[in-house]
Amino acid sequence: MLQLFLRNCAFRIIAVGKVRKGWIQDGLAMYQKRLPGLMITEVRDASLPREAEAILAALNSNEVLVPLSEEGEALTSVSFAKRLEKYGSQRLAFVIGGADGLSAELKNSTQWQLSLSAMTLPHELARLLLVEQLYRAQTILQGGKYHRGS
């Protein structure tokens, strides 16, 4: 199962808005090189219902939608890696809302919501944190030395 997961490791981030800060762009570029299966799709800022429509329109039928929300499930890095492994070769599409978050309808229509923090984060920073955690999860599952936590 582990080898299948690593071989088919493909994630997508659907994010509202653009990244404007150079240091975040640099960090994203670095992790995207390390995660060749990662795709990032940006949707325009709009009202929550319109953003939800754009997010759902961008979603492929074979993708599992995982919204990021402060109300979502908080996981350790190791627990996150194990959760990703359970999805096997299914493609996960993580969704990061804009300044107003995500519509309740979108969040409630999914099986799993993920929380990066109980605090509200700027969407640009949430994107960088998520990409780093996806990379960390991959190295945990591969037995790499990047993750040094317990």
Curated annotation (Swiss-Prot):
Record Pfam families: SPOUT_MTase
Record InterPro entries: Alpha/beta_knot_MTases (IPR029028), RlmH-like (IPR003742), tRNA_m1G_MTases_N (IPR029026)
Keyword Methyltransferase: yes
GO cellular component terms attached to this protein's record: cytoplasm
Keywords: Cytoplasm, Methyltransferase, rRNA processing, S-adenosyl-L-methionine, Transferase
Enzyme class, broadest EC rank: transferase
Annotated protein name in UniProt: Ribosomal RNA large subunit methyltransferase H
Originating gene: rlmH
